[in-house]
Every structure is written in C-alpha cells, then in structure tokens.
Amino acid sequence: MLKAYVLIEAEVGTAVKVVTLLKAIDGVLSCDLITGGYDAMLIIETPDMITLSELLNSQLRTIPGVLKTITCVAIPR
C-alpha cells in the first residue's frame, strides 16, 4: 500500500465543510483541521501511485472550496 500526507488550503469559511467532504472519500484514513499555512491535513492510503493520482485529481481537487494541495508520499522502510 502507498501512504500519502496531503495538505489542503481551503477558501475562507469553507474549511469545516471541506473536511467533512474529504472524510467521505474512500482511501482517506484521517482528515483533520490544522493550524498554520494550511487548513487541513489528510492521511491517504491507496494500492499504488496511479490510484493515488486518480483520487487526487478526480475526487479531492474537485471538492468546492479546495484551493491548493501539497502531497507528500511516504517512503517505505
């Protein structure tokens, strides 16, 4: 399995709604509101990089209120 951490920047006033919608996506293990330069952080697990890419492009980034994402893929040990 491939694990990734995703930082989300949301439009002002939409962070709570965005997090609620993100939690409903299959493959999202956790999603929390955070402090700092971003509004939320997700932990995602997918079978492979292709599935991760599809999840990010067709589901996550299409949620109303999502302005920007940064994805960090975990390096297996």
Positions of the model-derived regions?
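A compositional/biophysical signature of low hydrophobicity enriched in polar/charged and small residues
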Residues: M1-R77
